[in-house]
Regions:
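Short, basic alpha-helical/linker "hinge" immediately adjacent to a nucleic-acid-recognition surface
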Residues: 1-3, 9, 20, 29-84
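Short alpha-helical elements of helix-turn-helix
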Residues: 10-16
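Mobile genetic element proteins and their domesticated derivatives, centered on retroelements
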Residues: 18, 32, 43-46, 54, ...
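Short amphipathic helical patch at the helix-1/turn junction of helix-turn-helix
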Residues: 22-24, 87
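Basic, flexible linker segments flanking DNA-binding modules
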Residues: 54-155, 226-234, 313-317
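Mobile-element integrase/transposase regions
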Residues: 102, 106-107, 118-177, 184-206, ...
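Acidic/histidine-rich, metal-coordinating catalytic segments
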Residues: 199-231, 254-256
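Charged alpha-helix within mobile-element recombinases
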Residues: 232, 238-316
Length: 317
């Protein structure tokens, strides 16, 4: 009767050889533990198993067994179908994990989604790039100390409607979306609406931070030397005058890089809200505006941070 063949992995073979040297007194138990990167107690257990079972003593008893917590193949197939279907099209791994739990009652981690995607040879939504080395501006300490206003034109409803703009007010200390509105384009009326909503729902902030769009500044915002000597002040835009009357300081950004935080927020919203609006069946700008409170609440619940100073820098309208 022939001997049974034993198949060992490279790691198992190394463990068997090292423990065998120990058993032959070629090395000590401490040296065996160091060579294998194990504790002395672990190598002692291996030695006892090999003494009793021979080479099979290094084979893990779960080898070849399907883990008890492994996903059923049928569930993996369902997840792959969701990955390639229209419903969750263009969804990243983290967002898909959230949406499957919310809409399909499928609880799987983003890392599980990623493993299934890689095994199915499906590309990621975005290539992973190393983070850029840049110095982030420190957040303001108090909620309401600074609110950033900006707009983002985008195909928010994909091919179900023409592109339109999202105007949003973002608190700098917390990252909260204070309020937002969808508009056909970025315009003065839209920012008046945004500011009124902000004042009514959250109060009046100390300062707002915007880009240098003509909505926010007068085309005649540079004075001649003669005008400066005469004591004339820079004329304000219609929106700038409204901020002055509300007692809100208006800070203009000098470079697009100065608005990095709000620009990154809009990238996140474009990634997520396009899919969320699709799942809601939204087909018009008016319907999109009705869904904004729900979208804002969900975003703030997931992404807002606590301010470093709990006091609020807000006064009522």
């Amino acid at each position: 009767m022939g001997q049974e063949r034993i198949s060992l992995t490279e790691q198992e073979l190394r463990r068997y050889k090292v423990i065998s040297h120990w058993m032959e007194s070629s090395i000590t138990g401490v040296e065996a533990a160091a060579k294998l990167g194990l504790s002395y107690r672990q190598v002692l257990r291996l030695k006892k198993k090999i003494s009793k079972e021979g080479a099979t003593g290094v084979i893990h008893k779960n080898r070849g067994r399907k883990p008890a917590h492994a996903l059923p193949d049928s569930l993996k197939t369902t997840i792959r179908e969701h990955m390639t279907g229209d419903k969750y099209h263009n969804c990243n791994d983290h967002h898909l994990s959230e949406l499957l739990a919310e809409h399909e009652k499928i609880q799987v981690s983003p890392s599980t989604i990623r493993r299934i995607r890689i095994k199915a040879a499906l590309p990621p939504k975005k290539k992973r790039r190393p983070p850029k080395s840049h110095r982030s501006r420190k957040r303001r300490a108090q909620e309401g100390e600074l609110v950033q206003l900006d707009g983002s034109p985008h195909h928010w409803l994909e091919d179900r409607a023409e592109p339109f703009s999202l105007l949003a007010a973002i608190d700098d200390a917390t990252g909260k979306i204070v309020t937002a509105v969808f508009r056909p384009q970025e315009d003065t009326e839209g920012y008046f609406q945004l500011t009124e909503q902000m004042a009514r729902s959250a109060g009046i902030p100390m300062a707002v931070y915007t880009d240098r769009h003509m909505i926010f500044r007068s085309p005649k915002d540079k004075l001649t030397i003669e005008q400066e000597l005469a004591g004339e002040s820079v004329p304000l835009s219609q929106y700038g005058q409204a901020l002055k009357e509300l007692g809100i300081e208006h800070i203009l950004a000098f470079t697009p890089q100065a608005k990095g935080r709000v620009e990154r927020l809009f990238q996140t919203l474009q990634d997520r809200w396009v899919i969320e609006l699709r799942l809601m069946g939204v087909a018009t700008l008016e319907e999109a505006n009705k869904c904004l409170p729900k979208l804002i609440e969900k975003h703030n619940r997931m992404f807002a941070v606590a301010p470093s100073d709990k006091r609020k820098c807000i006064h009522p309208p």
